Design a protein with these regions (language model features):
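N-terminal cap/lid segment of alpha/beta-hydrolase-fold proteins
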Residues: 1-30
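Short beta-strand element of the alpha/beta-hydrolase
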Residues: 35-45
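Short substrate-entry loop that stabilizes the transition state in hydrolases
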Residues: 46-67, 73, 78
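Active-site catalytic motif of lipid deacylating hydrolases and related acyltransferases
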Residues: 74-89
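Alpha/beta-hydrolase active-site loop
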Residues: 85-106
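Alpha/beta-hydrolase fold nucleophile elbow
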Residues: 108-121
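Conserved small/polar residues in nucleotide/adenosyl-binding loops
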Residues: 124-130
C-alpha cells in the first residue's frame, strides 16, 4: 500500500489543502484499466489532521491487502461545515475534493454505492446531507 501526502490549491478554501491518501498495491488493482476502485473518506477528529489516522491507529496495517483508496483530508478544526466567516469545508470536502482526487486517481470510483465516509461520530454526522459523491 502506498502512502501519499498531497497538497493542492483548493479554490473553495482559497488556500493550499493537505490530503493523505492510502493507495492499494498494484497487485490488488484487479485490472490495469479499472476505473471502479472503491474509496473511503476518513475524517479526523478535533485537533487532528490528515495524518492522525496513520499516527494513532493501525489503519495502514488493517487496509494492507485491500483494493480500497483511503482519502484523509485536513480540515483543522473546521467541523466539516461551511461557515459565514470561516472556511467552506463542507463544500470543499463534498464537492471539490472528490473531483480533484478523481483527477489524481482516474481509476477511483465515481459510483455513490462504492464511496464511503467514516470518522469520529461527533463529526461525521455533519457530512450526511445529499452530495455528489460523499
Amino acid at each position: 500500500m502506498a502512502v501519499m501526502n498531497i497538497e493542492y490549491y483548493s479554490e473553495v478554501l482559497d488556500m493550499e489543502w493537505g490530503v493523505t491518501v492510502l493507495y492499494p498495491d498494484a497487485s490488488r488493482v484487479t485490472e490495469p484499466d479499472c476505473t471502479d476502485i472503491p474509496v473511503l473518506y476518513l475524517l479526523h477528529g478535533m485537533s487532528g489532521n490528515q495524518n492522525s489516522w496513520l499516527k494513532r491507529t493501525n489503519v495502514e496495517r488493517l487496509l494492507r491487502g485491500t483494493n480500497l483508496i483511503v482519502i484523509m483530508p485536513n480540515t483543522s478544526n473546521g467541523w466539516y461545515t461551511d461557515t459565514q466567516y470561516g472556511f467552506d469545508y463542507f463544500t470543499a470536502l463534498a464537492e471539490e475534493l472528490p473531483q480533484v482526487m478523481k483527477r489524481f486517481f482516474p481509476n477511483m470510483t465515481s459510483k455513490r454505492e462504492k464511496t464511503f465516509i467514516a470518522g469520529p461520530v461527533s463529526y461525521t454526522h455533519l457530512t450526511l446531507p445529499t452530495t455528489p459523491y460523499v
